[in-house]
Structures are given as structure tokens and as C-alpha cells.
Amino acid sequence: KIILFANQKGGVGKTTICGLFSNYLSDTRNVSLLVIDADPQQTFASRRKDDSRRQKDIPYNVQSVTIKDPSSTRNIMLTLRGLAGTTIIDTPGSLTQEGMKELLANADYIVCPYHYDLNTIDSTRAFILAVLRLKQAYPQIKAQFIFVCNKYDVRVGKGSELQAWKIVDEFFKKYGILA
């Protein structure tokens, strides 16, 4: 399986959740894992290098990949598609980034972190609709959305906010799985 962590909104915890999920699969589920940082910021890969300096036995490495060239990105994805195990990819924060279409075309899942503020909701909704337009233009894109609410505390929120959040969740459920 190829799992992308993607959202065009920055600060939603995409890289952090990608790392947590990778740790879970590696440590708890003992899954054969390849982790790739395709985000130009290379935050995940940089953190993992720091980890490897402090620890001897890290359970997995994070490979840095540049996706600026769609042709080479397509070749990388075809290679990944043929591998056993699970590939986790931390993606750039923009669908307009060269190579994103190739990532999406070969993914099984798009894990899309979000949180309940208007800017994030609007940006995440725009991201969903942009991916849906890409799916229409490129039918080979079959990836299923998994939405992960981040920075959510069940003890917080007025009645009106809770109702608004429920509407947001219902909207996201139309397009994928709400985790």
C-alpha cells in the first residue's frame, strides 16, 4: 500500500501525524515500512537524521525524495508500487507542486489532517475539491481519503461550534473515511 499524508493547509500536523503513524506501523504492527519525505521542507527526514544521531537502533529510515520532475516521480512511484510492504509519503503542501499528480495517481490512501478553524476547514475543503477535479481528469487516481482531526479536545467548544464541527465532519464523510 502507498499512503500519502497531504493537505494544502500548513500547520495541520501533516508531518507529525505521518511520523506517529509510521511509528505505530513499525513498532506496534511490525509492518514492513518504507517512509519517504517528498516535502521540499524535508522536516521529517531532518528530524529522523537527528534521531539516528541520538539512537542506535531506529526502526525505520526516512528517505528524501525530490518530486520536481514528473517523469522521474512517475518512475519512482512505479517502483514503489512493485515493493512489498507499506510506503508512507509525507507530501508537499500544494497540489500545484510538480510531481504531486504522480504521487496521487499511485496512492491507495490520502490521509488528510485538519482541525476545526475556518481557515483550515476552507483550505481542506478546497484541497478535497481540487483532488476530486484531478480524479475526474485522471481516472487512474483511485486514492481514498482518510480525514484525521488534529488538535481537537472533546471538552472544548460551545454548542454552536460543536454543531458546526458536526456539519464539517458530515461534509468530509461524503468524500472519505473520518478517523
What annotation goes with each model-predicted range?
Residues L34, P92-L178:
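Conserved catalytic-core segment of NTP-binding enzymes
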Residues Q41-I58:
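P-loop NTPase switch/communication element
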Residues K1-D37:
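Walker A/P-loop phosphate-binding motif and the immediately C-terminal alpha-helix
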